Design a protein with these regions (language model features):
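Right-hand nucleic-acid polymerase module
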Residues: 1-79, 87-153
Length: 153
């Protein structure tokens, strides 16, 4: 069901501004290189989906910054994951596809082609009602490193 049709016209502008602001913020976090769409063979709860995704990232994508959104499945119970990855060009997308498929289910792992890809991602998945999202910035991408200076510099 598209709840947008139940939003008052005056509030639609505010909702659109929120989507744009979220897209700008996510884009500012890192130069995203890969976008993923990851499903589960079973009806994963939001917590199970998040746990499995984070476990996959820890085991297979150590040192990779990522932003993810958990979204309800449209045609059945359960959740699936959409994510953006950075600092991952040394990883084989084909190998990662196989690892996810063998363990969890169907997936798509594609390169990010433009800023619009990130904005569209946010509009479609992150700002939906009922979506749950998270971010992990690693190493130099972490905000604590942005303005870091040694004492005495």
């Amino acid at each position: 069901m598209n709840i947008a049709r139940y939003i008052e016209p005056a509030d639609r502008v505010q909702a659109a501004e929120l989507v744009v602001a979220m897209g700008d913020w996510v884009h500012s976090l890192a130069p995203w290189q890969v976008i993923t769409h990851l499903t589960f063979a079973w009806e994963a709860s939001v917590w199970s989906a998040e746990r499995c995704y984070l476990k996959f990232m820890k085991r297979n994508m150590w040192g990779v910054s990522h932003f993810y959104a958990l979204e309800e499945n449209p045609g059945r119970d359960g959740f699936h994951v959409h994510s953006l990855w950075c600092d991952c060009l040394s990883k084989s997308r084909r190998d990662l596809w196989r690892r996810w498929f063998d363990r969890y289910g169907r997936n798509r792992i594609e390169p990010v082609n433009s800023r619009d890809d990130v904005s569209d991602y946010c509009a479609k998945y992150v700002t939906k009602e009922g979506a749950w999202w998270g971010v992990k910035l690693v190493g130099q991408r972490h905000p604590a490193f942005k303005d870091f200076k040694l004492v005495g510099e």
